[in-house]
Amino acid sequence: MTRLDVQNRRIENGFRLTRVGITGVKKPVVVHRGGKDNHLTAEIDVFVDLPSTQKGSHMSRNVEIITEMIDESVRKKVKSLEELAGSICKRLLDRHEYAGYAEVRMSAHYFLERKTDSGRKTLEPFKLMAKATARRGNGLMKLIGVEAEGMTACPCAMETVQHKLSEDVPELAKLGSKVPMISHNQRNRTTLMMEVPEHVEVEADDLIDIVEGSLSSPTYGILKRDDEAMVVMKAHRNPKFVEDVVRDILGKILKKYKRLDDSVHVTVRSESEESIHKHNAFAERITTLGELRESEER
């Protein structure tokens, strides 16, 4: 008895579909970077396009490919999530002969050691994001992204408070910036993503450092009293809007990646969870290094 291949059946009302696939696949991944193995639990989404002449995509092939590539990554160590995403992307096009486009997205939580001002060591969580896209015959593009949390302090409220307090206590005006002024503050969540050609490497740790260094202050999982005071003082000596965070990151990207091509895409997204409002503050820039360089030259 001949088995019917329902997916390959022709249909009359056919329209091409941009992405068809599976989402939310969780797999263990070992990334070898900086001389050490990083054990991550990755969430993976994979897609291919579907021509108008085909009823369905062969979903089981996607699971098979992911399983094969994860197994191979244990034996042949991968350097990054985006490298693994790219390898999966290529294999998707090999197995889905009807597809002209493939896309893989991956995310994982990642921990780095940090030190508080007193020297206490802590392991702090960050989020890694990777994406790879390939068009048959047109090569591969990959994206590396990070998400970090920290603290911002509002500069507008700070100046207003300083003005009002100086009216009541004139001596404060003489101190100027020597004493940090009170303000409302926020937990900030910022994402930085860069899309580069297949052969270009961008280090995730560098992106995390850029994001953390652009906030009013990093935050930590554990803080004793002195460290807690230092975090608060540091943030209020370095007040920032979400707009400031995004612009500071863009400036650091230009300095750090002078040799990358103008075509490299950059996305910076920052959101602060307001403490005195019921809404959040948000800022974003989606651009290329070329556009940023043109803006800098003006």
Regions found by a protein language model. Name each.
Residues 1-298:
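N-terminal intrinsically disordered, cationic/polar leader segments
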